[in-house]
């Protein structure tokens, strides 16, 4: 019997979320790394609409190894809902929770820095 491949997720930071060839497009080891790159792009290339994207590696899915934007806000969640496979996938939902934590930590840090 063939061993079933583990389903995994990979993250990317895109300097230009719409046209990846217009800027840097970096494969990241973790969501935290992708978020740091995304923040850098927001400071240096905000007009290029930076994004964080993900790819699910699942040999049993037609969506395997396709990149898709990770929602950066609740209004972006609508795009994810267009693809039920992604919207309901536990790895994607965990990534969204992690991203929300990272964003909250960044906001707290920003408020602390302003208060100084």
Give the predicted meaning of each segment.
Residues 20-24, 63-65:
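Surface-exposed loop/edge segments in extracytoplasmic proteins
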Residues 28-49:
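A short, charged, amphipathic alpha-helix used as a generic interaction element across diverse proteins
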Residues 108-116:
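Non-Sec secretion/translocation targeting segments of pathogen effectors
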Residues 43-109:
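Short, mixed-charge low-complexity intrinsically disordered segments
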Residues 10-11, 31, 43, 92, ...:
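Short, intrinsically disordered, low-complexity terminal segments
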Residues 24, 28, 58-60:
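Function-determining sites in protein domains
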Residues 2-22:
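Short aromatic-glycine-(Arg/Gly/Cys) micro-motifs in beta-strand/loop hairpins
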């Amino acid at each position: 019997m063939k061993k079933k491949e583990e389903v995994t997720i990979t993250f990317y930071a895109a300097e230009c979320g719409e046209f990846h060839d217009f800027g840097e497009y970096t494969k990241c080891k973790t969501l935290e790394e992708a978020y740091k790159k995304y923040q850098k792009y927001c400071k240096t290339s905000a007009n290029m609409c930076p994004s964080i994207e993900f790819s699910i590696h699942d040999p049993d899915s037609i969506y395997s190894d396709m990149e898709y934007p990770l929602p950066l806000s609740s209004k972006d969640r609508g795009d994810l809902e267009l693809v039920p496979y992604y919207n309901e996938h536990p790895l994607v939902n965990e990534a969204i929770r992690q991203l929300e934590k990272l964003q909250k930590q960044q906001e707290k840090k920003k408020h602390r820095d302003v208060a100084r």
